[in-house]
């Protein structure tokens, strides 16, 4: 008996057509042509920051076009198979539909990322909270989780700094995710993450609760006008260290930068040279200063308009329970799964996509 796929194909076609309208594919093609002209200008590379911004936007725009065109081709192929009525082709098309539907849904989420900085790379900082050695171990687990998530998507990452705890785990870690819409995607992870498990560090095998904070900021571009006066900086050079303060470098190449007006401190010790560490630390400092400015502007807007405070900022957003049962649950969207090992190995897309949809619905109601 032939499978009738007409209704599913019709629904997917309507969804994809809506996505093409929102993304304005023809507009994307014009944008790509303009960026290609800019990238071909030999003078562009005299300004490395601008050149990198242009090439990043070009890569992102080409990626959007390729995703839409690829999905449209796949849907057209399935529709053509359905029209032919061949049972073997229909069976193959029916098997392909769930994956195509999932991919279209993923692109639909991408259309919701329209914030001013959503297109940027992301700086992610992890910090151990309450919970002692378990919190430090939890911070290390989160670092691995996010790096695995990026690896699954083929995204480049760069770890700028890790501060190891005395017994195990990490006090903090800072890394960059280099991918189109990395900030818009990962900003859903900003907040406090709570772990419940039997502590491997407790001789009595008691259940322990530990916390770690995740802070996500966009990478700064020249257009953001985040100007830093050299006289506002204190730069300390020191030797990179490993667990227990043991030196792992034979030269003083690690860099700590303190922004005196705000008290913001950033550190980088994972690069090979002092100059590379300083450059990486400045990237993080600029991102933090931009985020501080945005927070101040948002607070002033709320004061003027009398709008509600953002209670989700810095608050507990997700529970990871490994004992007495297995469950990861997001407290904002109620998305949950018992596949804790998968989540900790980077399977975060269901949580991230649900939060992006939830965030947009909240913004639309405001």
Curated annotation (Swiss-Prot):
Q: What molecular functions are annotated in GO for this chain? A: translation release factor activity, codon specific
Q: Does the keyword Protein biosynthesis apply?
A: yes
Q: Which domain of life is it from?
A: Bacteria
Q: Name one GO cellular component term.
A: cytoplasm
Q: How is it modified after translation?
A: Methylated by PrmC. Methylation increases the termination efficiency of RF2.
Alphabetically ordered keywords of this record? Cytoplasm, Methylation, Protein biosynthesis
Q: Which residues carry this modification: N5-methylglutamine?
A: 246
Cell compartments where the protein resides: Cytoplasm
Q: What does this protein do?
A: Peptide chain release factor 2 directs the termination of translation in response to the peptide chain termination codons UGA and UAA.
> Its family?
Belongs to the prokaryotic/mitochondrial release factor family.
Database matches in NCBIfam families? prfB (TIGR00020)
Q: This protein is called what?
A: Peptide chain release factor 2
Q: Which organism is it from?
A: Frankia casuarinae (strain DSM 45818 / CECT 9043 / HFP020203 / CcI3)
Question: Gene behind this chain?
Answer: prfB
């Amino acid at each position: 008996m032939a499978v009738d796929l007409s209704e599913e194909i019709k629904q997917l076609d309507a969804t994809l057509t809506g996505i093409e309208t929102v993304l304005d594919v023809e507009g994307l093609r014009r944008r790509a042509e303009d960026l290609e002209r800019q990238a071909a200008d030999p003078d562009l590379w005299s300004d490395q920051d601008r050149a990198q911004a242009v090439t990043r936007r070009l890569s992102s725009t080409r990626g959007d076009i390729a995703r839409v065109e690829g999905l449209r081709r796949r849907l057209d192929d399935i529709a053509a198979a359905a029209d032919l009525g061949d049972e073997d082709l229909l069976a193959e098309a029916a098997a392909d539909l769930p994956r195509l539907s999932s991919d279209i849904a993923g692109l639909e989420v991408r259309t919701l990322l329209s914030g001013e900085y959503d297109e940027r790379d992301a700086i992610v900082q992890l910090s151990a909270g309450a919970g002692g050695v378990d919190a430090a171990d939890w911070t290390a687990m989160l670092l691995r989780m996010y790096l695995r998530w990026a690896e699954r998507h083929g995204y480049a990452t760069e770890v700028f700094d890790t501060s190891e705890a005395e017994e195990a785990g990490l006090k903090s870690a800072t890394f960059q995710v280099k991918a189109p819409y990395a900030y818009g995607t990962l900003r859903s992870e900003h907040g406090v993450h709570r772990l419940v498990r039997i502590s491997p560090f407790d001789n009595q095998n008691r259940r322990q609760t530990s916390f770690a904070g995740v802070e996500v900021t966009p990478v700064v571009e020249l257009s953001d006008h985040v100007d830093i006066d050299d006289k506002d900086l204190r730069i300390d050079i020191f030797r990179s260290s490993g667990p227990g303060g043991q030196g792992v470098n034979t030269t003083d190449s690690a860099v700590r930068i303190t922004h005196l007006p705000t008290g913001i401190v950033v550190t980088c010790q994972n690069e090979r040279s002092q100059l590379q560490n300083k450059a990486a630390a400045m990237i993080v400092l600029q991102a933090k200063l931009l985020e501080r400015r945005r927070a101040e502007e948002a607070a002033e807007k709320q004061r003027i308009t009398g709008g509600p405070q953002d209670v989700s900022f810095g608050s507990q957003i997700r529970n990871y329970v490994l004992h007495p049962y297995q469950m990861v649950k997001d407290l904002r969207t109620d998305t949950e799964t018992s596949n804790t090992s998968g989540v900790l190995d980077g399977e975060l897309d269901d949580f991230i996509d649900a939060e992006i949809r939830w965030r947009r619905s909240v913004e639309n109601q405001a």
